[in-house]
Amino acid sequence: MIYNYLYLILITNFLILTIAFSLNLKLKNAGIVDVIWPLLFISNIGIITKTNPNLSLYQLVFLFIIFLTNLRLFIYLLIRFIKHHPNEDTRYTNFKSSFPKFPNLAIFFIYQFQGIFAAILFIPLIPALLTNKNTLGTIEILGIFIYLIALIGEFYADKQLSDFKSKNNDSLCNSGLWKYSRHPNYFFEWLNWVSYFIYGLNGNNGWLCIIPSLTMLILLTKITGIKPSEELMLKKRGQIYETYIKTTSAFIPLPPKSL
């Protein structure tokens, strides 16, 4: 059964990202894929819902928290994209410059890679999502509680940064949640995936739900999240950001250190 879902999800992601690539060509802005990213998970939820018409309470809650996370992220990223368009994210500009002879083909492949990666994150959740039970125990309640912390935390981290940037283009945001973590948005994004793991523990093969949370932890802290973001900020802010690094936790919100 999992193989059937894998096939459906990969095909769906491929089609969605092919449409996203067409939008990229029309808008001349590869950053549109960031807006599309949460829609991949929403479409995957649609597949589960469509193929399981009689969903249990456990399934409905699990699907809803994943849906709400990605709906919020979609709205936030769409607003951000509209605000900055036609300026393209430097990640994609730099990526295209690495392939001067075939930049569009390179972008197409990086889009499709994101579709595969989204499937890798979602597939381990499916056995738990297919668990048919109508009760929520202590573990599920704990998962929901952690999820609410993650949802609220990510919302405020994004809002605080957005509000700060609108008033202080040339300064460093180190107030609010950003006083306690250099990347609170990434931390709470990861906490979403932790909540899926906790909620799914008592589901079918619930231990598999740890795979996406560990994958996102590595991705955000070592590959596409903190690392490139801090390299850019060090170039832009120099000594100010070096001081921020010395006094403020990189990921987990902690009391600031004194120099």
Task: Locate each region found by the language model.
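Broad structural signal for hydrophobic residues in well-ordered alpha-helices, predominantly aliphatic
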Residues: S22-L23, F95, M233, Y244
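Hydrophobic alpha-helical segments and helix pairs
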Residues: N70-L125
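A broad structural signal for alpha-helix termini and local helix breaks/kinks
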Residues: K26-L27, F99, R237, T248
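Juxtamembrane helix-capping/reentrant segments at transmembrane boundaries
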Residues: L27-S43, P86-F109, S171-W178
